């Protein structure tokens, strides 16, 4: 009988900074059980588990001779088999063997593309589920223009003929695939392993970013992945250090929103990662308990009157441009709804807009937190060098 060990991964959302002990600002504790299977095959000897700082939705276990086992929190498992090694004959039936090199990935989870870019593994991506016009990352648009990355259809309507003819060897879906399980099943019937990226379910914003380590394992670029993640973790550390040095400053109240085409206001649920980024950046999200935490949707739509009551006295407004497009001035914002002219942040000029690549640059979450922190600071000199936010005049 095979022996399995259950390790409880308790992730306390706290970052201990050298010399100051400043916590992350998030009172979130998430416990998960991800099974460690020491005996997936008589040919492989279990060695260790990858250390993760924030991510809890996956695990990577190392075995002898360079074999790696990726386990996703939904229960799916993938054995990454080195190029010069054989697939063990007695491998557990639920484990999908994936032989390296993996060179023709169909990447439907668009937020993961920046992770491949950050570890110089775009040569491993052959197909995307986002057409060229939908990309705000110039490098991806250029690769599609050159034909190096091909649009192969959305998550619910992949071009099976194209995928098969071009030799797709791995599919990375986003959570939307759960709405069309028949697509996942059909891809599996063709013998193509399908993994679902669950980064959007991570409790801590940097947990999303830490999925780059999984893709480092998949592509043989673990060192590059660690470096890319550490850069973002260092950005957060700098912000928390600055907050510790300025802890007497009151946290500004912050609203993050956009106006829909029919005049309603879309805001993030309190449990979403953006409000958590605002907290880490030193702000206070205006909604203390908005939305059902059990419902995994990220946002809530409300009428302007309700938003007005909660956000009128907010110290800072951040307009989310990723859905309805960018705005360039406070006048343009107020033109969308005259009630915004009454807002404290509008009258003081503390209104910001996100760049449209904010969502797609998933490997810049630490940098985005740093930008938010700069926007919240009273020192005007710290507001000039932001990349993902710009102040409206």
Where are these regions (language model features)?
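Structured C-terminal subdomain patch of bacterial secreted/periplasmic proteins
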Residues: 25-28, 202-231, 241, 316-393
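Bacterial Sec-exported substrate-binding components of ABC uptake systems
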Residues: 20-113, 224-256, 380-393
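C-terminal motif of bacterial Sec signal peptides marking the signal peptidase cleavage site
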Residues: 15-19
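Flexible, glycine-rich surface segments
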Residues: 239-328
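Sec-dependent signal peptide recognition
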Residues: 3-10
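A short, structured surface patch at a secondary-structure boundary
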Residues: 68-74, 78-164, 170-176
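Extracytoplasmic ligand-binding site segments that recognize negatively charged/polar headgroups
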Residues: 103, 110-119, 128-139, 179-182, ...
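Structural recognition of the beta-strand scaffold that forms the well-ordered cores
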Residues: 104-107, 124-129, 170-174, 194-197, ...
